[in-house]
Amino acid sequence: MMSFGSFVYIACLLLNGANMLLQIFCVIMFSDLEMDYINPIDLCNKLNDLVMPEIISHTLVTLLLLLGKKWLLFLANLPLLVFHANQVIHKTHILDATEIFRQLGRHKRDNFIKVTFYLIMFFTLLYCMVMSLIQEE
């Protein structure tokens, strides 16, 4: 039988991997906008549909780590959770097609930082999951 700690690591790993792929997709879409392969309205329509699922899944990851008493990983995820909460409170999480070219550099930078964060967390969670499953045996 799998322990709750192993379940937390597996669930967080899957959600974190999905968020990482989502951010890579966003970076590709922003690059397409720079190269004029996609228009701003289509970009905003596609990416705005993906913003809340990312925020919700990252919130779920953070809550699972808190419930699983994985304090160090919880604290590592807390700054991004605060960043997401700040975006939602100030309503800057939604992309505006009329403003996207002026804010493109900031959005690309934020997405590269998120990709890096999710990549580091992915391998950290993978290591923790493997160690947790080995210790159960």
Curated annotation (Swiss-Prot):
Compartment annotation: Endoplasmic reticulum; Membrane; Golgi apparatus membrane
InterPro entries: Cornichon, Cornichon_conserved
Pfam annotation, one family: Cornichon
Coiled coil: none
Membrane topology: Multi-pass membrane protein
GO BP annotations, alphabetical order: endoplasmic reticulum to Golgi vesicle-mediated transport; intracellular protein transport
Bilayer-crossing regions: 10-30, 63-83, 115-135
Statement: the UniProt record of this protein carries the keyword Lyase: no
Keyword set, alphabetical order: Endoplasmic reticulum, Golgi apparatus, Membrane, Transmembrane, Transmembrane helix
Taxonomy, superkingdom: Eukaryota
Gene Ontology, cellular component aspect: COPII-coated ER to Golgi transport vesicle; endoplasmic reticulum; endoplasmic reticulum membrane; Golgi membrane
Residue ranges annotated as Cytoplasmic topological domain: 1-9, 84-114
Topological domains, Extracellular: 31-62, 136-137
GO MF: signaling receptor binding
Primary role: Regulates export of the secretory proteins from the endoplasmic reticulum in COPII-coated vesicles.
Sequence similarity: Belongs to the cornichon family.
Protein name stated in the entry: ER-derived vesicles protein erv14
Phylogenetic classification of the source organism: Eukaryota, Fungi, Dikarya, Ascomycota, Taphrinomycotina
Gene: erv14
